Amino acid sequence: MVFSSNVLEHVPDPMGLIEEMIRATRPGGLVYLSYTNWYSPWGGHEMSPWHLLGPRYAERRYIKRYQRKPKHEVGANLFRVHVGPVLRALRARPDVEIVAARPRYYPRWCRLLLRLPGLREVATWNLMLIMRRVG
């Protein structure tokens, strides 16, 4: 099993990380991936929810309130990762089977949110994926 929790949004090449996780997994093995997506209320981490009005605005607001820069800087150690593109990329791969996909921290029935393209980006605070490497 290869495991990553709340790391994906902190790397400049999220799809590259996913690719490497799958590559490092034996056939039949599992990949666990969870991440906070950008459009969720917590996508801007400590600058949330103000990141939804733009990262520069969120940073200025944070500095004004706390008199210091935030720990995360969009484009340096926090990157915009979305639910739809990740799901589409994984579904298109012949070497991966998605075993489970649902919003983490929510009841299981909330996995239905992932079927609603616009809503899933905002309502899925943290996406949890379990994948099996095929072949």
Positions of PLM-derived features:
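S-adenosyl-L-methionine-dependent methyltransferase catalytic module, highlighting the catalytic core
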Residues: 12-20, 24-26, 30-129, 134
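A short His-aromatic
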Residues: 6-10
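A conserved beta-strand element that flanks and buttresses the S-adenosyl-L-methionine
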Residues: 3
